[in-house]
């Protein structure tokens, strides 16, 4: 592929929380913005303000005080196609400033995505945006590429969904994939709830964004939850303060680690599921006995919800406790893991061997949207 931006492939990782988009071959996404579509709650009264009927991404975020914010992607799966189209339109025309009809486009999807969902994505890309070629790749597999491996088990935890995906020699093993509908957004909700216990009230969609910021800046994973709780109760050494947009300062203590602890103990938010360490172990146990050793030695973390300080050590401790005692266990936590899905997509789309994998407009016209199941696995 040429080096100029004229025919370069585009890579768009549509997460539940953030859209990461850019050009194949780059080492980081050029555009990262929230997957939000906002609509005004009030009637416009000033003439000539050029008010729009909807706002996308950062613009929606900055005007959140007067908007109702909606996320079109829930639990990694697109639920609102009209809003999703707005997000893609915004990605191509406003963020990347490209004409989609000139660029092959690589999209990502959650593992175990419904079939109808992939078809609809394919259809919108070819019929609404007229892309010349496209491909849909599984997010966790791309994260593994980004870490330079072809075998390993990926814990991909984003804003909407968490997966354990074992990959062997580049193939995801679908029977062993574990999906957990517990991720960053649920942790934000839980933090909103436990802050209410302290007497701080966060209710609106705009206030939720403030809590998300508190979570990202102050939360961490405790190595030993009970010990940490005791420390928090007996001293104020773990307390941190945070200034709200209106200048009010709030203090948070054990909430800092109680919030992400939910990943290991989903019962905190009333979920019956096993924690992320157990789902990782269960996923490995569903794989062939001969490849387990390779999976234990290559636990790759990916996604924004794995960015908490202390999470790798805690995973190491928990999986070591579950695994056979002689097993070598390694948790790989790349520093750029927030964007590793996108980076993997960028690597994949710029490989010369990948160029015959694209679904072309011609193939789509001949076979229709179902072509995606034949060409993208």
Curated annotation (Swiss-Prot):
Alphabetical UniProt keywords: Acetylation, ATP-binding, Cytoplasm, Cytoskeleton, Hydrolase, Methylation, Muscle protein, Nucleotide-binding, Oxidation
Job of this protein: Actins are highly conserved proteins that are involved in various types of cell motility and are ubiquitously expressed in all eukaryotic cells.
PTM statement from Swiss-Prot or TrEMBL: Oxidation of Met-46 and Met-49 by MICALs (MICAL1, MICAL2 or MICAL3) to form methionine sulfoxide promotes actin filament depolymerization. MICAL1 and MICAL2 produce the (R)-S-oxide form. The (R)-S-oxide form is reverted by MSRB1 and MSRB2, which promotes actin repolymerization. Monomethylation at Lys-86 (K84me1) regulates actin-myosin interaction and actomyosin-dependent processes. Demethylation by ALKBH4 is required for maintaining actomyosin dynamics supporting normal cleavage furrow ingression during cytokinesis and cell migration.
Xref: PANTHER family: ACTIN
InterPro entries tied to this protein: Actin, Actin/actin-like_CS, Actin_CS, ATPase_NBD
A Pfam family: Actin
Modification N-acetylcysteine occurs at: 2
Recorded family membership: Belongs to the actin family.
Gene Ontology, cellular component aspect: cytoplasm; cytoskeleton
Other comment: In vertebrates 3 main groups of actin isoforms, alpha, beta and gamma have been identified. The alpha actins are found in muscle tissues and are a major constituent of the contractile apparatus. The beta and gamma actins coexist in most cell types as components of the cytoskeleton and as mediators of internal cell motility. There are two different alpha-skeletal actins in Fugu rubripes.
Modified residues (N-acetylaspartate): 3
Enzyme category, top tier: hydrolase
Assembly and oligomerization: Polymerization of globular actin (G-actin) leads to a structural filament (F-actin) in the form of a two-stranded helix. Each actin can bind to 4 others.
GN (gene name): acta1a
Compartments, record wording: Cytoplasm, Cytoskeleton
Residue(s) carrying N6-methyllysine: 86
Reaction(s) the record says it catalyses: ATP + H2O = ADP + phosphate + H(+)
Recorded superkingdom: Eukaryota
The protein, known as: Actin, alpha skeletal muscle A
Location (main, coarse): cytoplasm
Tele-methylhistidine modified-residue sites: 75
Molecular function terms from GO: ATP binding; hydrolase activity
Record-linked Gene3D superfamilies: 3.30.420.40, Actin, Chain A, domain 4 (3.90.640.10)
């Amino acid at each position: 592929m040429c080096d100029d931006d004229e025919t370069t492939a585009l890579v768009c990782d549509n997460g539940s929380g953030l859209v990461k988009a850019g050009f194949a071959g780059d080492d980081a996404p050029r555009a990262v913005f929230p997957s939000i579509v906002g609509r005004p709650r009030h009637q416009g009264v000033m003439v000539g303000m050029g008010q729009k009927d909807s706002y996308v991404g950062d613009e929606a975020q900055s005007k959140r005080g007067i908007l109702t914010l909606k996320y079109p992607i829930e639990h990694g799966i697109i639920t609102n196609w009209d809003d999703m189209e707005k997000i893609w339109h915004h990605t191509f025309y406003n963020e990347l400033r490209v004409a989609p009809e000139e660029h092959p486009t690589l999209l990502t999807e959650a593992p175990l995505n419904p079939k109808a969902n992939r078809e609809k994505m394919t259809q919108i890309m070819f019929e609404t945006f007229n892309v010349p070629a496209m491909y849909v790749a599984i997010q966790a597999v791309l994260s593994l590429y980004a870490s330079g491996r072809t075998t390993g088990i990926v814990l991909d935890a984003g804003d909407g969904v968490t997966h354990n995906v074992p990959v062997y020699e580049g193939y995801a093993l679908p029977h062993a994939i574990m999906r957990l509908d517990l991720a960053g957004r649920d942790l934000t909700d839980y933090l909103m709830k436990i802050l209410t216990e302290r007497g701080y009230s966060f209710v609106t969609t705009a206030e939720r964004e403030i809590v998300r910021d508190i979570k990202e800046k102050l939360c961490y994973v405790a190595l030993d939850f009970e010990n940490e709780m005791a420390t928090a109760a007996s001293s104020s050494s773990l307390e941190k303060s945070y200034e709200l947009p209106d200048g009010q300062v709030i203090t948070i203590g054990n909430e800092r680690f109680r919030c992400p602890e939910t990943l290991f103990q989903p019962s905190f938010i009333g979920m019956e599921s096993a924690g992320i360490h157990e789902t990782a172990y269960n996923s490995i146990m569903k794989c062939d006995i001969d490849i387990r050793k390779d999976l234990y030695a290559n636990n790759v973390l990916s996604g924004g919800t794995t960015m908490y300080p202390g999470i790798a050590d805690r995973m190491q401790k928990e999986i070591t406790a579950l695994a056979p005692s002689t097993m070598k266990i390694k948790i790989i936590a790349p520093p750029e893991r927030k964007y590793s899905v996108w980076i993997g997509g960028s690597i994949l789309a710029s490989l010369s061997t990948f160029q015959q994998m694209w679904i072309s407009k011609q193939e789509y016209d001949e076979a229709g949207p179902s072509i995606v199941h034949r060409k993208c696995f």
